[in-house]
A protein has these predicted regions:
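Conserved catalytic core of the tyrosine transesterase superfamily
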Residues: 97, 103, 133, 138-140, ...
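Acetyl-CoA-dependent GNAT
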Residues: 5-76, 80-93, 140-150
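Short secondary-structure junctions
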Residues: 3-5, 119-120
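Conserved active-site tyrosine of GNAT-family acetyltransferases
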Residues: 113, 118, 137
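Short glycine/proline-centered loop/turn elements that form peptide/ligand docking sites
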Residues: 83, 105-109, 126-131
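Conserved GNAT acetyl-CoA-binding A-motif
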Residues: 90-101, 124
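Conserved catalytic-core motifs of GNAT/GCN5-like acyltransferases
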Residues: 101, 119-135
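Short amphipathic helical patch at the helix-1/turn junction of helix-turn-helix
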Residues: 69, 103-104
């Protein structure tokens, strides 16, 4: 199974995945998810095994807005597959770099991002509601026609 593009019609299902994957103070509602998908340049993917990713492109840059995998579906490559799908989609829209924020203590996510070419380029102090810092990471995107898989 591979990640499939999402539409606002899937917002409730995406919100359920997000709610199961994140702490209550970090959960996005179906309304917020719909708004992000509907933004100019907004897009996302859902994996039927229990994962979702939302991103957006602006001119020649892309940003991962959120990536969530159900706890029972982790360590099966879903996060990697979703991230690769978003990187490919962004590259097809002429984005040449992708950015994201990740909690400094989220070691599993940081390893995933590093495995796909992301490197730390900054820090947002006290970014999260609990006061934790976010690391800003960046990856160069592969031009269309070339494979981003690592």
């Amino acid at each position: 199974m591979s990640p499939q593009p999402v539409t606002t019609a899937l917002a409730e299902a995406l919100a359920a995945i997000h709610a199961a994957a994140f702490a209550p103070d970090e959960v996005w509602s179906a309304t917020v998810i719909s708004l992000h998908i509907g933004l100019p340049g907004g897009f996302g993917f859902m994996d039927p095994r229990g994962g979702m990713i939302l991103a957006r492109t602006i001119v020649d840059e892309a940003e991962i807005l959120t990536l969530a995998v159900l706890p029972e579906a982790r360590h099966q490559g879903l996060g990697r597959d979703l991230l690769r799908a978003a990187m490919r989609k962004a590259a097809k829209t002429d984005a040449r770099a992708m950015f994201l924020e990740v909690a400094e203590d989220n070691i599993a996510a940081r390893r995933l991002y590093a495995s796909q070419g992301f490197t730390e380029v900054g820090r947002r102090k006290r970014y999260y509601a609990n006061g934790d810092d976010a690391l800003v990471m960046r990856a160069a995107l592969t031009p269309p026609g070339e494979d981003v898989a690592r």
